[in-house]
UniProtKB/Swiss-Prot annotation:
Organism classification: Archaea, Methanobacteriati, Methanobacteriota, Methanomada group, Methanobacteria
Keyword flag Coiled coil: no
Membrane topology: Multi-pass membrane protein
Biological source species: Methanothermobacter thermautotrophicus (strain ATCC 29096 / DSM 1053 / JCM 10044 / NBRC 100330 / Delta H)
Family as reported in the entry's similarity comment: Belongs to the auxin efflux carrier (TC 2.A.69) family.
Coiled coil: none
Cellular component aspect of the GO annotation: plasma membrane
Name of the protein described by the UniProt record: Uncharacterized transporter MTH_1382
Protein localization: Cell membrane
Broad class of where this protein is predominantly found: membrane
GO biological process, one term: transmembrane transport
InterPro entries assigned: Auxin_eff_plant (IPR014024), Mem_transp_PIN-like (IPR004776), Na+/solute_symporter_sf (IPR038770)
Entry keyword set: Cell membrane, Membrane, Transmembrane, Transmembrane helix, Transport
Length: 302
C-alpha cells in the first residue's frame, strides 16, 4: 500500500464510508447487501491481504510481535470490565449489560484498523496491525464461549467458527510460508490482486451498515463505550506497551489499533446470544463516527 499522511488516510477512509452510505440512500445497494460484501471480505479479501502482507514482511522480530495480541486482549478485557461494572451499577438487564461489555471489549482492529494503520505506517505497520487483530479474534472466541456458558447454550458453534475463521488460517499460513521460505508461485500473484479489493470493500460495507435510528435511545451508554474505545483503551495500551519496553513502530501501531471503535463482530455476538442488538449497534455507530475525529488526533500524537 502507498504510505500516506494521517489526514489524507482518514479522509480517504471517510470518503469510502460515505460512498457506501450514499449508495444505500440512492438505492443502488441496500443494508442487506452489507452481509454479502462482508462474506467476500472475511472469506476472500482479508485473508488474501493478511497472507500477502505477512509473506512479504520481515518477521525477524517475531518474538516482540507476539506480545501485540496479548496487549490487545488485556486492554479489551479491561475496557469490557469497566463497561460491565457501569451497566451493573445502573441496574441494566443482562442483555444490555453484556451488550455494553462486548461493544467495549472488542475493537474494529481489522475492518477499520487495517486500512488506517497501513495508510499511516505503511506495510510494516500493517503487519503489526494483523498481529493485533489476532488478539481481537481470540477475544471474540473467549467472549462467545463465555456468553454461551452463561446462557446455557453450546459453545461448539463459536469454537468451530474460530477454528475455521479464514483470516486466522491466512495468518498462520503467512507466517509459516515466510519463516520457511516457501514459494507461492502464481497463487501469490492471484492473492495480491485479491488483497487489493479488501480496503474499498471494507469501507463501502461499513457505510452500508450506518444507521441513525438506534442511537437516540442509547446516547449515554454509547457515549461511555465510545470514550472507552477511543480514549481510555489507547491510554491503557500505551501504559502497557511502555512497561513492556515497546518503542517505535510497535508502540505506535499498538496504541493506534487500541483506539479503534467497537467491532462489527460485537453485533454478531449480540445476535447469537440474545443481547440488546440495538444497543450494540448504537455503540458501533457512535464510536465509528467519532473515530473519524479521534483517529487523526491519535495519529498526530503517535
Amino acid at each position: 500500500m502507498i504510505f500516506m499522511g494521517s489526514t489524507e488516510t482518514v479522509l480517504s477512509v471517510l470518503v469510502l464510508v460515505l460512498l457506501g452510505y450514499i449508495l444505500k440512500v440512492l438505492g443502488v445497494l441496500g443494508e442487506e447487501d452489507a452481509s454479502t460484501l462482508n462474506r467476500v471480505v472475511i472469506n476472500v479479501a482479508i485473508p488474501s491481504l493478511i497472507f500477502t502482507s505477512l509473506y512479504r514482511a520481515d518477521l525477524s522480530g517475531i518474538s516482540d510481535l507476539v506480545l501485540i495480541p496479548v496487549i490487545c486482549m488485556i486492554t479489551g478485557t479491561l475496557s469490557g470490565t469497566i463497561a460491565y461494572l457501569w451497566a451493573r451499577r445502573r441496574g441494566l438487564d443482562s442483555g444490555k449489560t453484556w451488550g455494553l461489555t462486548v461493544a467495549a471489549a472488542m475493537m474494529n482492529s481489522g475492518f477499520l484498523g487495517y486500512p488506517v494503520t497501513a495508510g499511516i505506517f505503511g506495510s510494516e505497520g500493517l503487519v503489526r496491525a494483523i498481529f493485533y487483530d489476532t488478539g481481537t479474534t481470540l477475544m471474540f472466541t473467549s467472549l462467545g464461549l463465555l456468553l454461551s456458558h452463561i446462557s446455557g447454550g453450546e459453545g461448539s458453534r463459536i469454537m468451530k467458527r474460530a477454528v475455521f475463521f479464514p483470516p486466522l488460517w491466512a495468518f498462520l499460513l503467512g507466517v509459516i510460508f515466510n519463516l520457511w521460505g516457501l514459494p507461492t508461485g502464481i497463487a501469490g500473484t492471484i492473492l495480491g490482486y485479491l488483497s487489493g479489493a479488501a480496503v474499498p470493500l471494507i469501507m463501502i460495507s461499513l457505510g452500508l451498515t450506518l444507521n441513525f435510528r438506534f442511537l437516540r435511545h442509547s446516547v449515554a451508554d454509547a457515549t461511555l463505550v465510545s470514550g472507552l474505545r477511543l480514549l481510555i483503551s489507547p491510554l491503557m495500551a500505551a501504559g502497557i506497551s511502555y512497561v513492556l519496553a515497546f518503542r517505535g513502530l510497535n508502540f505506535s501501531v499498538t496504541v493506534l489499533e487500541a483506539s479503534m471503535p467497537s467491532a462489527m463482530l460485537a453485533a454478531v455476538l449480540a445476535i447469537e446470544n440474545d443481547l440488546d442488538v440495538d444497543l450494540v449497534s448504537s455503540c458501533i455507530f457512535m464510536s465509528t463516527i467519532l473515530s473519524l475525529v479521534s483517529l487523526p488526533l491519535w495519529s498526530v500524537v503517535l
